[in-house]
Amino acid sequence: MKLAKIAVLAIALGSGSPSAFTTATRTAAVTIDYPEDGSIFPPEITPPTFLWRDSSASATSWRIDISFADGSAPIHALSKGERLRIGSIDPDCVADTNKPPALTPEEAAGHAWKPDPAMWAAIKKHSVNAAATVTISSGPRSRGSVRIRTSRDPVGAPIFYRDVPLMPSELERGVIKPLAESAVPLVAWRLRNLAEPRSHVVMRNLPVCANCHSFSADGKTMGMDLDGLENNRGLYFLANVKPEMSIANRDLIQWSTAKGVLKGSARIGFMSQVSPDGRFVVTTIDPLQAAGKSDSSNYYVANFKDYRFLQVFYPTRGILSWYSKAAGVLQPLPGADDPRFVQMGAVWSPDGKYLVFARAEAKDANPPGRPMAQFANDPNELPVKYDLYRIPFRDGKGGDPEPIEGASQDGMSNSFPRISPDGRWIVFVKARNGLLMRPDSQLYIVPATGGKARRMRSNTRLMNSWHSFSPNGRWLVFSSKARSPYTQMYLTHIDENGNDSPAILIENSTAANRAVNLPEFVNIPPDGLRSIGGPALEYFRWVNRAVYLQKHNRLAESIAMWRRALDLKPDDALAQRNLGMDLLMTGHRAEAGAHLQRAAELKLSAAVADHPEDAQTHEALGRMLLEHGKPDQALPNLHKAAELDPQSAAAHCDLGAALLALGRLDESLAELRKALALDARFAPAYYNLGLVLSRQGEADEAVRQWRKAIEINPQYKEVHDSLGSAFYARGNAAEALSHWRQGTSSPAALRQMAWLLATWPDQSLRNGQEAIALAVRASQLSDRNDPAVWDTLAAAYAEAGRFADAVLAAKRALALAERQNRPDLVTAIQSRIRLYEGNKPFRVSWNSGASRADRAPR
């Protein structure tokens, strides 16, 4: 066979960390550090990089001999022993808060060689039945050997994982924020086929953190926890896996609005897991009695400036809940919903019949007086030691949790269980405190029914966690910081007896200054997942851009971004509110008001969904919709409020107001009389009753009802507006003006006052300057698009002797009236323009039969 080509090593190694090298063949002058003796490789993996050190300083070349126990001819190669080099660096991930990876002196003294693909294929072929021996020598007495083997068991599936920068955020007690805000869009998600030398990106540039992910056993369903906007950590997507996945809004779940008894309590969804059949999701949420509390009361969080271990994070309160994909219902799991404990990190058995989860005594995450931890495993960390428990699922009925022998009550913290696909084994993380990313975390394996737990051979010297079984159960992928503070991905083989092999590095998983975490095997073909995108994820990108532009006062651009976000998600309160605020700041008052109103409606609609049996919430939403001119939408909520609380005068009054707005006067009258029967001093009922009577032509009786309302509440502005209009209709201008001055100062009320002050026949009541001021204010409030307001302003200018201004204002009113197809107003304005052009003001000719256009423009 031809000599192997010499490969230049491009692999991330530690920065100032102790050597990760092993002690294989210590008596020899050549020490082979990787792979370790006894390593097992999957049949499809690409060539590994062999690493060794030679005590002979004069050695300049090495002979590599691979011999086989199956009788095949040995393979020989020569290597110049290239020095180790750091892999490629992502410049976007270089920051003041981290350091580039660097070699220790020991690592810098090492050498590297990688067999070419043809040679590696031959090595794998002849090392299946028995181990191959790899000997590296620089002379007759300088040699070292390791035995390696190729498994018959393929990995059989690609690995989905998260690829993150290590750019710590500022320390903020109790806030879950491991990365600086600017670093979050740098997070990527990759898929790695071990038969290929590199991975490919399937999702990137999300402005929110997407983290714990899981797949159904057949690889057809994917779920992922999302940190939504405004620190919303209760978002989740559940979607069908396709080569090009498009996440739609229908695929998003907000735990706090999912149907079921847990409404409003699910502030955070944590370590959610899709069931093997894809029908259910189990997640950890806040305990019911903690609903509305801050996140910091349920999670111990410490963020550090040390990029190597930049966060300590674990729940101190929580219950397990399960979600039905078919029903859209979120329910607590009986037996794992005890508020005395924190119950979290549940995983499914392969048949979906039971769950294994971590449990500890519940406690306050931030007790008063406790110092904040400054580093991982700081003695000041809140002590929490989890035990593993098993509980039946029984279609959501749960049962009695039972501790798992070997993974509980051992003085250590046992967490992150993963059950083998054959149901025989549980691999979990054991550490002194907390869970997951601990410097001392080690992988242990225990029978699924409980028993003696064994420390796995594949453990590296520093942090072992985030593990996942291959679909055939013969391989385990996990993450470690053994070679670098920038976490890397490793592989170990597990046989039928639960014995595992030394760790195999999955090389070239990302740049040398980025970290790999949350690796998970996915039961799909190598090209079964090429991209994840879609409108739901694009929405986050537009919103993130809009927020950036908003912060930098680039409001015209941010408005465009908010509009794009709303194109993707029209019923989003956040985007509606922010668009409304930006429009308001740029002077578009009317459009701003519409968006702000919609945002408020959406917020209350969410509250109704959370509390469907709460009469006050239904009433609040119904009243808001009614105020926004949507009585048809308000009616169902107001009916429900009156049904839930039949003794509420307010509920019957609001229902009566909605029926009035819909023209159902008799029904409205009945509801208002019910309200007054319940509370004879309920002023709003008298107000609405007056409106009904006025619509029925009983003007005098309407005034009597409004006077009763004023007797109860002299400051009732809407009643003053109605009384003003009633007295104006009677020709009592002084009384009308008195009430309007005490009214709402709405555009309509301001316009009517201005019209009276500008046009009334009695000179003692006219005041041109005040009329101008009131009309200008009405125009501002109506976004300058109401022809009646411009008509009123023209009359006010004429009363003040400003006839040229009167003509201009009247012509603006005429143009608007023509555009809005208001022929009666057009005719009236045309006649008034002729007066102003002749330097004459307009005077109403008031009598009971005068046309409405002569009394006051509408």
Stretches found by the model and what they are:
Residues N553-R564, M585-K603, Q616, E627-K640, ...:
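Structural signature of tandem alpha-helical TPR/SEL1-like repeats
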Residues P18-A556, A560-R563, D567-L568, A573-L574, ...:
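Sequence signature of WD/YWTD-type beta-propeller architectures
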Residues A515-I532, Y539, G593, D762-R766, ...:
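Terminal, low-structured helical/coil segments at or just beyond the last alpha-helical repeat
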Residues Q550, L584, E619, L626, ...:
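Position-specific recognition of the canonical hydrophobic site in helix A of tetratricopeptide repeat
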Residues L568, L602, D610, L644, ...:
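Structural marker of alpha-solenoid helical repeat scaffolds
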Residues R623, A657, L691, A748-V789:
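Alpha-helical adaptor scaffolds
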